[in-house]
Amino acid sequence: MDKIIKTISESGAFRAFVLDSTETVRTAQEKHQTQASSTVALGRTLIASQILAANEKGNTKLTVKVLGSSSLGAIITVADTKGNVKGYVQNPGVDIKKTATGEVLVGPFVGNGQFLVITDYGTGNPYNSITPLISGEIGEDLAFYLTESQQTPSAVGLNVLLDEEDKVKIAGGFLVQVLPGAKKEEIARFEKRIQEMPAISTLLESDDHIEALLKAIYGDEAYKRLSEEEIRFQCDCSHERFMNALASLPSSDLQEMKEEDHGAEITCQFCQTTYNFDEKDLEELIRDKS
């Protein structure tokens, strides 16, 4: 079971989220049949979305778009406050060999571009916020977004580790944020600890990576666990939703589908589930328009 644990330092100067997103990213890889670099890039963006959504309340939905200029194309993810996230990468077939340290290259294949966050509070007026991609490694781009757009100094680490067959081995991450009222010496102490932290990939390799992340973040300082919540890859598509999408088409288009294709087939971009609509379905839609 994937989870996100929310914590705060006893002093109230900092808060931290730590995540195990292994099953989330594994499900995404299986559904989209992504190759190595596409898997890691999509996985990191899914984790970034889980972090951002955990910061929201109510029925808020949050869309993250990594709009890069290189071979991966766009990466789109959508998360909600109930722990659900879905997403896809425009080019799932980017398969670049690992570096000498075993890391999968991502940044060069994301390229330059924008990190776009759309926050939908359900009021009909979603809020858009855009920052430039500074590295294409996703974690650094998320930290820059939080610091620049939300004016909250943040440290982010997230990664996806693959096994020898390029299947998802483990995935997770952390977010540390300075809270209002933090003293200069507290900030300096935490900055030093973050700078001295082992690489996120090293922490994820630990037997209990959640505890390893918390230990690396807080050291010997006291902290409180505020909550532990389940997170998952879950798409909200349905036959009814795509039926409504078809209903928005002109009658002439529906008639053409009926006569030439004898139906319609739609595949959800986010989860690759295919929905079929027969001639009777199309007839019903055409009749409703008349």
Curated annotation (Swiss-Prot):
GO aspect biological process, one term: protein refolding
Keywords: Chaperone, Cytoplasm, Disulfide bond, Redox-active center, Zinc
Coiled-coil segments: none
Intrachain disulfide bonds: C235-C237, C268-C271
Processing after translation: Under oxidizing conditions two disulfide bonds are formed involving the reactive cysteines. Under reducing conditions zinc is bound to the reactive cysteines and the protein is inactive.
UniProt keyword Cytoplasm present: yes
Keyword Cell inner membrane: no
GO cellular component terms given for this protein: cytoplasm
GO molecular-function terms, A-Z: protein folding chaperone; unfolded protein binding
Pfam families hit by this protein: HSP33
Family the UniProt entry places it in: Belongs to the HSP33 family.
Physiological role: Redox regulated molecular chaperone. Protects both thermally unfolding and oxidatively damaged proteins from irreversible aggregation. Plays an important role in the bacterial defense system toward oxidative stress.
Name of the protein: 33 kDa chaperonin
